[in-house]
Swiss-Prot record:
Compositional bias annotation for Polar residues: 98-116
Residue positions of motif Nuclear localization signal and RNA-binding (RRE): 34-50
Principal localisation: host cell
Subunit structure: Homomultimer; when bound to the RRE. Multimeric assembly is essential for activity and may involve XPO1. Binds to human KPNB1, XPO1, TNPO1, RANBP5 and IPO7. Interacts with the viral Integrase. Interacts with human KHDRBS1. Interacts with human NAP1; this interaction decreases Rev multimerization and stimulates its activity. Interacts with human DEAD-box helicases DDX3 and DDX24; these interactions may serve for viral RNA export to the cytoplasm and packaging, respectively.
Region spans: Homomultimerization: 18-26
UniProt-listed GO biological process terms: mRNA transport; viral process
Protein name: Protein Rev
Organism: Human immunodeficiency virus type 1 group M subtype F1 (isolate 93BR020)
Function recorded in the entry: Escorts unspliced or incompletely spliced viral pre-mRNAs (late transcripts) out of the nucleus of infected cells. These pre-mRNAs carry a recognition sequence called Rev responsive element (RRE) located in the env gene, that is not present in fully spliced viral mRNAs (early transcripts). This function is essential since most viral proteins are translated from unspliced or partially spliced pre-mRNAs which cannot exit the nucleus by the pathway used by fully processed cellular mRNAs. Rev itself is translated from a fully spliced mRNA that readily exits the nucleus.
Gene: rev
Modified how: Asymmetrically arginine dimethylated at one site by host PRMT6. Methylation impairs the RNA-binding activity and export of viral RNA from the nucleus to the cytoplasm.
Length: 116
């Protein structure tokens, strides 16, 4: 694991082992009994899986010092996006297709959404 010290690698592997044990301690329920009994067992199993997932997230975040999930990418507002069609409009050229640019000024692509 690049960029880490050996100690933190060992701690991370230990945390992964703990998480694996947690998931192995909650096997999927057997398909026996009445429909209602099976449904109840699956419902309880899903609740335990949810708890295990939350515990696993807490273990990983304490081990890594940050959340396990990546930070979502911030996208620019839609009002600033437009398709640049000034060079090759209607020619069918491949290089003009799908090229969107962000401009400094605001272009209205669609109306305000109200019907007139």
């Amino acid at each position: 694991m690049a960029g880490r010290s050996g100690d933190s690698d060992q701690e991370l592997l230990k945390a992964v082992r703990y998480i694996k044990i947690l998931y192995q301690s909650n096997p999927y329920p057997k398909p026996e009994g009445t429909r209602q009994a099976r449904r109840n067992r699956r419902r309880r199993w899903r609740a335990r899986q949810r708890q295990i997932r939350e515990i696993s997230d807490r273990i990983l975040s304490s081990c890594l010092g940050r959340p396990a999930e990546p930070v979502p990418l911030q996208l620019p507002p839609l009002e600033r996006l437009h398709i640049n069609c000034s060079e090759d409009c209607g020619q069918g050229a491949e290089e003009g297709v799908g090229s969107s640019q962000i401009s400094g000024e605001s272009h209205t692509v669609l109306g305000s959404g109200t019907k007139e």
